[in-house]
């Protein structure tokens, strides 16, 4: 069974030394319910709202450039508060077409930004400047320059940012990174992060489509170019799918910015690189035959860190992130975890195939839970009943935690308990501590996503990177690469480039 984003948000169950920032909340707000406004009301935002409605907040504003979505969001809030009067009062949620009206409201404490990627940075920075704490969907930014500005803005205005890298709220990811950070598999040589390839070039758009009334398409395009309306990019109204703007260079970064922002984020966490990053990018050694992607490679780029560890963009696996160490292997994905211990994990073809079922000569299988019933049934036919399999993700995590005494480990990572990512954000907005996916964490993950993306965009380019200054070294062209969109069109439209 695959774990959806929505169920993951609702179900994941805060220890660790917190980072503290002044919140600026009024005393009554700090002790009571906070007011939150939503910017964007697409599929992901609706999943988030389902969680936030159960938190200690009042949903008072819904903004979307699509009238149907906006009105549906307000109706949902009113219906929820009608059915749950202890949670809030119906009739208090107002709809907006322009997000600037939401962040201008003095009575709103928090905003949730769940718009297409090209809008994230500007809306986040403007909300921070107006005194709001921000929950922003991943990737936190569309470009490297934007990532630097979001970090700067969060510090300057003393407000909290929680990036929607919700895997950090999952017990399996926390356990995997605790094992890795505390040396359970020795020195890390390689991290494989498995996700899709870069976006498509926007040189082959669909024929212009007639647009039904009720959508401000100019505002949807925002900082990006004003392309003809395309329902493939943004279907009208309420729907359950994820639109194809994720696959368009003008508005996103394909799988690199989408799932790379999850699985490489876990790689950064496991490597202890939340406040740093790689020093070099090694390009992929092949190119695709896909003209719509500009013949770009879809995986294979490598990030090299100062200690010699490498994070590689893998081509696909049951596991989202795989750590290969000198004394073992740790694999993790949503709702699943596995660990082998005893000798060096060698990422050859045989090993990469075997981690799907998990049998290695000379290695102890510490825990193994795959959570794919059909997959495991097929493996059982081939390999037998696999009695070492654990009964659940939680059981597998507990076995590994006991085996390596993680409760007493020297390095203790921030752990979210109950309510998941949104609850962590609300708690931190109230008490002034920093959440698990704070601004710098999300920004640095966005940066490595764009380093990988940049390598593909430039025909498998390799270059050096300074993770202290966040600047390109040898092989990099700062102006084009840092702002990115300037190389695609004339620049950010309508002044929508973040200004701190």
Model-derived features with residue positions:
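NAD(P)-dinucleotide binding in Rossmann-like oxidoreductases
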Residues: 299, 304-416
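C-terminal helix-rich "cap/oligomerization" subdomain common to oxidoreductases
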Residues: 10-30, 294, 374-414, 427-500
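Core domains of carbohydrate- and sulfate-ester-processing enzymes
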Residues: 192-239, 343, 350-353, 359-379, ...
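Active-site rim elements
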Residues: 163-165, 207, 246-257, 285-290, ...
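Rossmann-like dinucleotide-binding domain that binds NAD(P)(H)
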Residues: 217-308
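N-terminal glycine-/serine-/threonine-rich beta1-alpha1-beta2 phosphate-ribose binding loop
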Residues: 1-133, 145-160
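A contiguous active-site-proximal alpha/beta segment in oxidoreductase catalytic domains
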Residues: 133-135, 141-219
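Active-site-adjacent bridging/hinge elements
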Residues: 229-244, 393-400, 418-426
């Amino acid at each position: 069974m695959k774990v959806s984003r929505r169920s993951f948000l609702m179900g994941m169950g805060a220890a660790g030394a917190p980072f503290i920032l002044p919140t600026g909340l009024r005393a009554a707000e700090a002790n009571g319910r906070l007011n939150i406004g939503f910017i964007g009301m697409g599929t992901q935002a609706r999943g988030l709202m389902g969680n936030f409605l159960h938190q200690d907040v009042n949903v008072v504003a819904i903004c979307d450039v699509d009238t149907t979505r906006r009105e549906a969001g307000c109706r949902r809030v009113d219906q929820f508060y009608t059915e749950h009067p202890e949670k809030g009062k119906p009739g208090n949620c107002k709809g907006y077409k322009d997000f600037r009206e939401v962040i201008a409201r003095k009575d709103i404490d928090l905003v949730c930004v769940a718009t297409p990627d090209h809008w994230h940075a500007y809306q986040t920075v403007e909300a921070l400047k107006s005194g709001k704490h921000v929950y922003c969907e991943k990737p936190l930014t569309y470009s490297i320059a934007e990532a630097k500005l979001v970090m700067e803005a969060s510090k300057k205005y003393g407000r909290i940012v929680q990036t929607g890298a919700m895997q950090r709220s999952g017990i399996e990811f926390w356990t995997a990174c605790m094992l890795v950070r505390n040396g359970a598999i020795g020195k890390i040589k390689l991290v494989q992060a498995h996700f899709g390839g870069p976006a498509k070039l926007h040189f082959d758009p669909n024929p212009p489509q007639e647009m039904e009334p009720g959508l401000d398409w100019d505002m949807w395009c925002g900082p990006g170019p004003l392309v003809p309306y395309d329902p493939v990019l943004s279907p009208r109204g309420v729907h359950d799918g994820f639109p194809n703007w994720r696959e368009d260079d003008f508005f996103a970064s394909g799988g690199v910015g989408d799932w790379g922002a999850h699985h490489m984020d876990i790689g950064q966490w496991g490597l202890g690189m939340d406040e740093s990053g790689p020093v070099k990018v090694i390009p992929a050694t092949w190119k695709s035959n896909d003209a719509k992607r500009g013949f770009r490679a879809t995986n294979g780029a490598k990030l090299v860190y100062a200690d010699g560890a490498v994070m590689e963009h893998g081509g696909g696996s049951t596991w989202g992130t795989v750590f290969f160490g000198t004394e073992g292997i740790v694999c993790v994905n949503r709702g699943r975890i596995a660990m082998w211990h005893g000798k060096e994990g060698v990422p050859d073809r045989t090993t990469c195939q075997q981690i799907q079922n998990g049998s290695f000569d000379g290695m102890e299988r510490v825990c193994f839970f795959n959570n794919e019933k059909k997959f495991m049934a097929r493996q059982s036919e081939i390999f037998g009943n696999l009695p070492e399999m654990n009964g659940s993700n939680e059981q597998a995590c507990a076995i590994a935690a006991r085996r390596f005494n993680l409760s007493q480990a020297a390095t203790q990572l921030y752990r979210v308990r109950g309510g998941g990512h949104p609850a962590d954000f609300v708690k931190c907005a109230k008490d002034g501590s920093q959440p698990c996916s704070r601004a710098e964490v999300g920004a640095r993950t966005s940066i490595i996503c764009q380093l990988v993306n940049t390598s593909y965009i430039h025909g498998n380019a390799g270059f050096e990177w300074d993770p202290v200054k966040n600047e390109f070294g040898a092989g990099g062209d700062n102006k084009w690469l840092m702002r990115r969109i300037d190389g695609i069109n004339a620049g950010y439209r309508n002044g929508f480039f973040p200004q701190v």
